[in-house]
Amino acid sequence: MSGRIKTAGRALASQCGGAAAATMDPYDAIEAFDDSLLGSPLAAGPLYDGPSPARFALPPPRPAPLAALLERMQAELGFPDGPALLRAMERWNEDLFSCLPTNADLYADAALLSADADAVVGAMYLAVPGDAERLDLNAHANQPLPAPPASEEGLPEYVAGVQAHFLAELRAREERYAGLFLGYCRALLQHLRATAARGRGAAGAGAQADRLRQLVAARYYREASRLARLAFAHMYVATAREVSWRLHSQQSQAQGVFVSLYYAWPQRRQFTCLFHPVLFNHGVVALEDGFLDAAELRRLNYRRRELGLPLVRAGLVEVEVGPLVEEPPFSGSLPRALGFLNYQVRAKMGAPAEAGGGWRRSGSTRTRGRAARSTTGRLQRPCCGPRRRAKCCRATPRQRLRARGEPRHTSGSGAFSQGRRPGRVCRLGWACKARSGPARGGPGPSPVRSGLGLSRARGSPGPGPACGGPSRARGGRRRASPANPFGGTYDALLGDRLNQLLDF
C-alpha cells in the first residue's frame, strides 16, 4: 500500500507543478495546492459585497380567499416561481430543512395559530405585527460575517463565526416573516367569517358562530399551512442564498487555507442542508460512515444549482474531466423535500398548542370549541413526546485540521503511518440535532474540544430534532466506517481512499 501511496503522491504533485514533483508526498501536494486548477468559480452566480438593502413588506392584506392571498404573497415576496418550487420538492428526496432551527418560540403566543377554534375566532380582530410597523423582510442581525483567516490556525473560530452569523440572520428574518404570516392568517380568517355569514341556515348569530367554527376546523389550518409553506420556503432559500454567495465571494479568494481540513458529516441531512459554512472542501471529506464520492457531490450541486446556491467544491473528490452536477434519482418510497419543509411548518404552527401544555386529540369530528383539523392534524402534531425529544443530542460535523509544520499521524498502515502524530481536530457546532447516541459505525467524540457549540438563551427552543422530519430508509449492509480518527482502521481506509482518488 505504501508504494501505491507514494506513486499517487507523485502523480498529484505533478499537477501542482515544479521540479519537486518527484519527491512530493500527498501532504506536500496539499501544501502546494493551486486553486487555479479548479477554474474561476466567481462566474457561477451573483456577488454580494455586503448585507442586502432593506425590503419592506406591504401592509397586512384585507380579507380574501386563499388563491388571492397566495398570489399577493408571491408578488410581495418577489417569489413568482414559489409554487413551481414547492411542486418540484415533491419529487426531491433531499433533506434541505430539518437541520435548520424551527424558532418555534416566535409563535408560542400567536392566538391565530391556536388549536382551539374558539381562541382562533377570538383573535380575528387582534393586531398583528404589520399593523404597527413596517416589516423589513431583509432584516439583519448584529452578528457580523467574519473574514476568512490568513492561516488554518484561525479556521475553527472562522467556521464558528460563519455559523453564528447565519443563524442570527435567519432568526432576524424569521421575526419579520412571522409577522407577515400572521397578517395573512388574519385575512384568511376574516374571509372565512364572511363566508360563514353567507352560508345557508346562518341567519342567527349562534348559527353563524357554529358555521365559522366548522370552517375553521375544516379549512383554516389547512389553508394557513399553504401560506406558511410559501412564506417560509422563500425565507429559507433567500437567506441561505444571500449568505452563501457572500461566503462564496470571500472564500473563493482564499481557497488554499481550507486545504488542510478533514471534513466529516455524520448525517446525510447535514450534507444536504441548504447552508454550508465552507464551500471549498478541498481536504478529505467523509459522509456518514464512508467517504464522499464524486457522484454524491454532483447530485448535491445539482440541487444547489436549482435553488440558486453556489456549488460546493472539493478538490480531492471532483473528477478531472466531466460535469460538476448530476441529476439525483428519485424514489417514491423515500421521504421528500416538501415533507421536511412541512416539518418546519408543523413546528411553527403547533407552537401555541405545545406551549399550552399538550396537544388535543384531533380527528374528523366537528365538535364545538375544538379544531378538528382532519388531514392537517398531522401537520401540527409533534413528531415525538418530550422524553424522546430530550434524548436528542447535538451532532456536529467534524473537521480535522493539520497545521503546517505539525508532526503527522503515526498509527496504522495507511497514508499517515510514517512517524506522524494526529493533527488538531475541531468540532463544528452546527444547527442540527442527532438521534440519541452516537451514529452507528461513525466516528466517536472528538478528543479535542474547541468550544464551537452555538450558544443560545436558556429555555429557548433549539433546532428541530432528527425525529421531527421523515427518516430516510436505509437497507443493505453498511459500509466500513472511519471508526477512530486516531486509530488504524481510519488510517487504512483513508490510505485506500487516497489511493483511489490519486491513482492516475
Curated annotation (Swiss-Prot):
Gene Ontology biological-process annotations: DNA-templated viral transcription; regulation of DNA-templated transcription
Keywords: DNA-binding, Host nucleus, Host-virus interaction, Phosphoprotein, Transcription, Transcription regulation, Virion, Virion tegument
Comp. bias regions, Low complexity: 361-378, 447-460
UniProt-recorded Gene Ontology molecular function terms: DNA binding
One of the record's GO cellular component terms: viral tegument
Coiled-coil region: none
Domain of life: Viruses
InterPro entries in the cross-refs: Alpha_TIF, Alpha_TIF_sf
Subcellular location: Virion tegument; Host nucleus
Keyword Transcription annotated: yes
Disulfide bonds: none
Pfam families in the record: Alpha_TIF
Region of interest (Disordered), ranges: 354-381, 395-421, 435-486
Annotated family: Belongs to the herpesviridae tegument protein VP16 protein family.
Subunit structure: Associates with the VP16-induced complex; binding to host HCFC1 activates VP16 for association with the octamer motif-binding host protein POU2F1, to form a multiprotein-DNA complex responsible for activating transcription of the viral immediate early genes.
Role according to the record: Transcriptional activator of immediate-early (IE) gene products (alpha genes). Acts as a key activator of lytic infection by initiating the lytic program through the assembly of the transcriptional regulatory VP16-induced complex composed of VP16 and two cellular factors, HCFC1 and POU2F1. VP16-induced complex represents a regulatory switch: when it is on, it promotes IE-gene expression and thus lytic infection, and when it is off, it limits IE-gene transcription favoring latent infection.
Name of the protein this chain belongs to: Tegument protein VP16 homolog
Native source species: Bovine herpesvirus 1.1 (strain P8-2)
